[in-house]
Amino acid sequence: MHSPGAGCPALQPDTPGSQPQPMDLRVGQRPTVEPPPEPALLTLQHPQRLHRHLFLAGLHQQQRSAEPMRLSMDPPMPELQGGQQEQELRQLLNKDKSKRSAVASSVVKQKLAEVILKKQQAALERTVHPSSPSIPYRTLEPLDTEGAARSVLSSFLPPVPSLPTEPPEHFPLRKTVSEPNLKLRYKPKKSLERRKNPLLRKESAPPSLRRRPAETLGDSSPSSSSTPASGCSSPNDSEHGPNPALGSEADGDRRTHSTLGPRGPVLGNPHAPLFLHHGLEPEAGGTLPSRLQPILLLDPSVSHAPLWTVPGLGPLPFHFAQPLLTTERLSGSGLHRPLNRTRSEPLPPSATASPLLAPLQPRQDRLKPHVQLIKPAISPPQRPAKPSEKPRLRQIPSAEDLETDGGGVGPMANDGLEHRESGRGPPEGRGSISLQQHQQVPPWEQQHLAGRLSQGSPGDSVLIPLAQVGHRPLSRTQSSPAAPVSLLSPEPTCQTQVLNSSETPATGLVYDSVMLKHQCSCGDNSKHPEHAGRIQSIWSRLQERGLRSQCECLRGRKASLEELQSVHSERHVLLYGTNPLSRLKLDNGKLTGLLAQRTFVMLPCGGVGVDTDTIWNELHSSNAARWAAGSVTDLAFKVASRELKNGFAVVRPPGHHADHSTAMGFCFFNSVAIACRQLQQHGKASKILIVDWDVHHGNGTQQTFYQDPSVLYISLHRHDDGNFFPGSGAVDEVGTGSGEGFNVNVAWAGGLDPPMGDPEYLAAFRIVVMPIAREFAPDLVLVSAGFDAAEGHPAPLGGYHVSAKCFGYMTQQLMNLAGGAVVLALEGGHDLTAICDASEACVAALLGNKVDPLSEESWKQKPNLSAIRSLEAVVRVHRKYWGCMQRLASCPDSWLPRVPGADAEVEAVTALASLSVGILAEDRPSERLVEEEEPMNL
């Protein structure tokens, strides 16, 4: 059923709101009129049109907003592009370290993406083509940024403009916060082609010498061997000397590995043995690689140490493989130029210097265990020997560079030099220099030997005499061949005398910088009489006077806790012999209670002390005190075994005030008492004499041996009836038990009116010290050498006027005992000039040098009245213990001053007086002799 009007196309139904359409009355062709869409179709098309309209509107708006952005992203003008990039680079280079971040720049991001893509492509190619060469792990060459990677990344990353003056390869991959890598881009390409082998010749080295004709090799004229340019500006120890120019690096490396590789193991292991050959097989051309000439010319006699140090590889076992080229083939092939002197070395001297090596033969047995090379564990990296270098001895390390942390338990295990330092290993591991090697010193070393004999080396503080003679220092002493060299010194030094005398050992000196660290935390030495400048000044004075070069310098060691406990209590040793670091190795339970009992006082300077005088440094005081005790003990053992003639220990802090459980008077451990006790325990000496001429009484030493008859203690000190520190040391303190009579105190009284001086001390030595010491007949003499009785000390510290010459004379007198086995240990003394003068006089006396004689007035002057009364009291008290005191009591002439040379007369008078004293002694007991004795004739 059709609706009305459906078949008439001119008729349309009326819809609400529509206008009536007029009828088309045209007779011609009429346009085709599409029928109106149905309402359902209109309903479906309306949302589609709406979405399209909204999409076009949004796209149009997006194009409008993107237009300014496109304008800003356009590449800048060429003139602005370079400046902007340079400014960005400068900001990166000059960026503050505190403001740096890990955000990578656009350049880095682009490079990173290129590198990643390049590696992915390379990995893909390797999987597809397995035979393709592998990519190295790291390439220092600039990366290539051209190729397909840029075209691929251009669709993802915007183009980054580069500087107009630099190509793109100047932007290597780098870390954003690494300044050295930023600087790398401005270096030329040649800086990346550095030598990779330390054995190669530097490009900056001076040009090599040309071969001279055979007739000019023996010429020794200055014109042919030296030029003005070969002085200090052209050092002898250049990196490679006059070796010929080396070949290319890559070629040389291949030839080196191909030649040496098959003959020995590869050095991939840091401890792998290194095989060096006497000879090398020639290549096809008939010549050897120039870079292998230093190994070719190396002689086995040059290498004394069992380990050979190669830079970067550590110590390597040094072996010699079988020679690959015989001597005949090597000599006839002309593979290298003959050896000759370098331009900066002096001329070989004449044969007159050869007798200087003759005295070395008698000292072989005594000095052989002492001459040693540098320890391999502490040797710095060294380069291989050059053909122009001669055999050298290596210097023993100085005391300041080798500070150890512990010492041996007992000196018996440390008698030899190689066993006294802990952790050194057997002597075979260190290597020793035989006398035959010393006798084979070439002429160029003989010249240096003569120079070393004529003057001491100020820098060699711990060298033994033989090492001083044979060692060739690294620096040149004569840079010109024409420089005159004196082969014989005008005056033979004591070192020359020691070399010429095989029966007299040397004098020992002990010093170490460890003892300098014991100082107050305030840092002001003027407020502390006992400071590090004392031993430092003495050591410098001995060097200035040339006495150190005449002695055998020792470093000493740190005393063990067991050695300290031979004199002091365990509590005392743990309190003052440990520091926070060493306590970590001990029993915490025992230390906790002891440390809680320790008390310190606050000093006026702001530091900490055991008392108002004795400062304490928690980190360094214990090490310094233990080092002083160990050094004196070590020196005493060497003298007791007659390895040394005598010795002087420049040590601090002092020790003669430290008793069994108390630290006082700047003292913590009694060094002399510990050395004496160790000598007794190890059977090194049966009878020991201790002389203490410090102005203060050695209360600690007296207490230690107060009951010991095998130790005679004689002290000369200011007493003033107990009113001078420490208050002990009265004349009637003679010992107890079996040790009664073996403690002698020369207690000076009378204050400083007048002060004691040379006449009083000379009288004490002549009347008391030497007679009792001769009667005791000691095996060894230990001296607590305090110099605070010397002139220059204020009244609270001494106030006496004993001269340095008098100290030297007293040392000479003591050397007449025990076969000259005398050991001096520094105790007190606080005026730097006075203690330096006194130490110099004592060391000169120990060496046997001529000491300045005392003035005639000192010999003729009579002791003051206070001194005579003090000496009378000593004779009275010890008359019943010593026969010499009985003889002196009845001999008035003995109180008169004696001039040197009158010893025979004194002995005659003493012998005559002893006869009458002996008769009286038979009739009356000694007690009645003391009571009924008439006053001496003064």
Curated annotation (Swiss-Prot):
A motif (Nuclear export signal) lies at residues 904-938. Residues 864-938 are annotated as: Interaction with SIN3A. Residues 1-40, 155-280, 331-361, 373-463, 472-491 are annotated as: Disordered. Residues 220-235, 350-361, 429-448, 479-491 have a biased composition (Low complexity). It comes from the Eukaryota. Residues 72-172 are annotated as: Interaction with MEF2A. It catalyses: N(6)-acetyl-L-lysyl-[histone] + H2O = L-lysyl-[histone] + acetate; N(6)-acetyl-L-lysyl-[protein] + H2O = L-lysyl-[protein] + acetate. Changing residue 692 to A: Disrupts the dot-like nuclear pattern. Its EC number is 3.5.1.98, 3.5.1.-. Its activity is inhibited by Trichostatin A (TSA), a known histone deacetylase inhibitor. Residues 2-254 are annotated as: Transcription repression 1. May be phosphorylated by CaMK1. Phosphorylated by the PKC kinases PKN1 and PKN2, impairing nuclear import. Phosphorylation at Ser-178 by MARK2, MARK3 and PRKD1 promotes interaction with 14-3-3 proteins and export from the nucleus. Phosphorylation at Ser-178 is a prerequisite for phosphorylation at Ser-204. One of its GO terms (cellular component) is cytoplasm. InterPro entries: HDAC4/5/7/9, HDAC_PDAC, His_deacetylse, His_deacetylse_dom, His_deacetylse_dom_sf, Ureohydrolase_dom_sf. One of its GO terms (molecular function) is metal ion binding. Highly expressed in heart and lung. Expressed at intermediate level in muscle. It is found in: Nucleus; Cytoplasm. Residues 505-852 are annotated as: Histone deacetylase. Zn(2+) binds at residues 520, 522, 528, 605. Residues 241-533 are annotated as: Transcription repression 2. Residues 190-204 have a biased composition (Basic and acidic residues). Belongs to the histone deacetylase family. HD type 2 subfamily. Responsible for the deacetylation of lysine residues on the N-terminal part of the core histones (H2A, H2B, H3 and H4). Histone deacetylation gives a tag for epigenetic repression and plays an important role in transcriptional regulation, cell cycle progression and developmental events. Histone deacetylases act via the formation of large multiprotein complexes. Involved in muscle maturation by repressing transcription of myocyte enhancer factors such as MEF2A, MEF2B and MEF2C. During muscle differentiation, it shuttles into the cytoplasm, allowing the expression of myocyte enhancer factors. This is Histone deacetylase 7. The gene is Hdac7.
